[in-house]
Structures are given as structure tokens and as C-alpha cells.
Amino acid sequence: MEQSNITIEQEEKGFVTLARTGTHEKIIQFLQEQKKGKLLDVPTGTGILSAKLSGLGFQCSCCDINADGFKADNITFRAGDMNKRIPYDTNSYDYITCVDGLEHLENPYNAMREFKRLLKNGGKLIISIPNYLNIERRMKFLFTGSFTKPVSQKMFKEKFNSSLAMMHINLMGYPLLKFLLESNGLSIIKLDIDKPKPKMFFLFPVIACIKLYCWFWPKKAKERYWLKETLSKEIFLGGNTLIVIAEKR
């Protein structure tokens, strides 16, 4: 897979991937098969994904609430808050990448409206979020009542610097994400994962019981709860990260 070269010096300066291993690779794999065009990466983090995509011929712009974290050279950057108006013109982009961003937002509904505004007709939105609906997370919720580790006030101050923007404050599952996309005229065209989780196979008896139970559901109930998708290998058996690709119609 062709990518731009990231030097050791850049890595030492913090020019690193903040997403889980496999996420950027899957996004790049998808975009390599698409026509080159204008791309907005928001939130961009260090800018490493845009640096790689720029090396593949995409015309990239970067945006993030944290300007100090941006490390990429020769790529335009604007500071912006996804809870508010993203500072770019309407119908400007062929692609938007939003890697591990929505779960940090107080207002993901606003962000989705902004994505719709910024994309050209036929433009594609590539989103990654934590996969809270894989079988491992579902079992964790069953036994603990929480999808993630609870955050104490001490942890909030020491680990997250008392900033909500650093936390996962929206534990968004696939059904809500699908609703947000479709209510803004964005149709899902592909689901993917970062990488498989081998230890999922230890939960095979539970997986088999759930699938057998749902097999007896009436057709209308299966459709109403989107079981074809929520019990798919990408979601139910998926990795830590769910990648959703949608198109503006």
C-alpha cells in the first residue's frame, strides 16, 4: 500500500497516529480505489492521515479544535469546533474523514449537519467510532452496566485535564449513527472494522445463542431493529473500531 513516508524525526515530534491500529489503513485502502479530489480531515489530530492521503494525490485540508497538536507540513490547517460551524464553504469537498471524533462531541447532531453542508452531492463521508455493539462490549455492559470504564473526578482532572473534548462523552452505537446519517441525506454504502479480535471466538457459545434466539423473530421485528446490520460480522463480531462510509445523495 503506497503511503507518504513519515520520518523518525517526525515521530519523535509527536507526528503519530492517534487512532487504533488498522483504522487509517482501512480508510486509505478504500480511498485508494476512489477518484482523487478535495478532502477534509476533521478532527485531524496530528494530521498524519492527511499527510498520507496527500501523498496519494488527494487535496487535503485539516481541521481540529486543538491547533497545538497539528504536526503536518505543507497541508492547510484551520482551528475549528465540530460542535459549531466548521469554518469551510458549503459544497466544498468530495470526501470528509472523521476518525474517532463523534464520540468526543457534545453535539454530534450539529457535526452531521455540517458534514452534509460541506460535502458535494455524491461526496463520501468516512467515519470511525468505537464499536460499542460488538459481543465483547455487550457482555461488558451486561455484567458491569457500562460500555467503558467509568470516569472519576480524579481521572477527569488528571488524565483528561478537565476537558470534555478529550473524553468519550457520546457512546454512540450503530443505530443512532445510522439515524444521524440518514436524517441528513447520507446513505450508508459500506461497513468495515479496524482489525479482527481473535478472543471473540471464546464467546462463540454466546454468539450462537443470540443468533439462534433472533432467528425466530418475525421478519418485521428483525427489520425494525436492523438485525441484519447489528448482528453482522462488522458490528456484532467486529473489532474495537467500526468504520462507516456514507454518500451524500
Predicted regions and their residues:
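Polar low-complexity intrinsically disordered regions
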Residues: 1-3, 59-61, 187-189, 246-249
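Conserved SAM-binding loop
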Residues: 27-139, 242-248
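A short alpha-helix capping/helix-coil boundary motif
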Residues: 7, 27-30, 93-95, 155-159, ...
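Conserved class I S-adenosyl-L-methionine
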Residues: 1-34
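S-adenosyl-L-methionine-dependent methyltransferase catalytic module, highlighting the catalytic core
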Residues: 14-18, 22, 48, 52, ...
